[in-house]
């Protein structure tokens, strides 16, 4: 009897530790409103691209796979973003990488008022200017998502819109 009790205790302990942490803590689900397959439009209603958002790595990472609708300078722009909650810093973060060699790293992010807010680390924007990017995803009431990208060239005192997109469900 003692051996079987010990066996079940050890088995329960092992199974408990084997659970996936990103499935247990609801903070990892804060960005789930973005998951889906989307047609993405600019503010004028023009199709800007398509985006597929999924969870990977045992639901710890929200992956975006973006493809633009039109070629620019002979290239169909595409990229991926990897979005995750960093439990050590208690911040959401995003890493964007694209097929032009571009990348943006957002290490400060949080979910508040039905929106995911990111700020990039400062970067050299050609020459003497240091810039910062702000990226906000708004969960809209009609099942859509708004993505608003902004840039500041004066340490966040003033912001200029780089793009403003609306994600509409494909189906």
Located regions from the model:
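Hydrophobic small-molecule pocket/channel-lining residues, especially in calycin-type beta-barrels
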Residues: 19-171
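Bacterial Sec-dependent N-terminal signal peptides
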Residues: 1-22
